[in-house]
Amino acid sequence: MIELAPIYFGAMGFQAQAKQCYLLQLRSIVNEPTPGEMEDALDSMSKDLTGAFEDTISRIKSLPKNRAQLGMDVLMWLCHARRVMSTEELSDALAFRKGRGSKLSKYRPSLSMILECCHGLVIPSADTGYIELAHYSIQEYLQSHWPDLFPSFEQQLASTGLGYLMLEEFRRGPEAIETSYQLIKKRLRDFPFASYAAHFWNHHITNVQAAEEIGPILIDSVYDAGAIASSVQIGRFERGFRSIYVDPRECLSRTPMHNAS
């Protein structure tokens, strides 16, 4: 076995960015079949983070089709989401399938699958339950290269958030309330992405309302009293509104004109 770390760090120095680059590329090097090929890979390694990210994303895209799509979708969400997401929220968002009226939990990718498909670009937090990009420089790279990496991210995030709230679970309307709000809490446990979707769907559609795939969903949602009322109830509950404003009758009092505004 050749000594990878001394060769690489000897060439680049013990700088934080070099260490990050090293960690991203080490996996591909140690998977080479022979010491000679490992040395060849080492010689051709990019000497900066931009090159390291390009190499890593190329490896993600070379995965089998569904795994490559999963890896890129994870990066898209973590780069462009309006707030940090929990692993459960992200997995639930990734499981959403347009055109299906019910929620299918069997499509949720596991944390281990997400990490495997992202080749070290994302990390989970054991303390908070959040999943994030592994380094701020990854965020900077993804944001600066979004036209090539995620050309339709706004439509994808908007259609996922709005479409998710049109699932049968939410179209049946807001939950009844009681002292401890157990039914609302259960809904949020069973549908982890509901919180994010309820809070941010309107932000994501701001720039894409006229898009072909967004228009029909948006029009349907405006006239779906149950779905909109469910979203309103979730938002109000999580913001700590008084029970009178979380009551399903109050949430259902919104008219299509309210929903369109």
Which sequence ranges carry the predicted segments?
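P-loop NTPase nucleotide-binding module
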Residues: 1-145, 152-180, 189-200, 252
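Hydrophobic repeat-domain scaffold segments
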Residues: 155-261
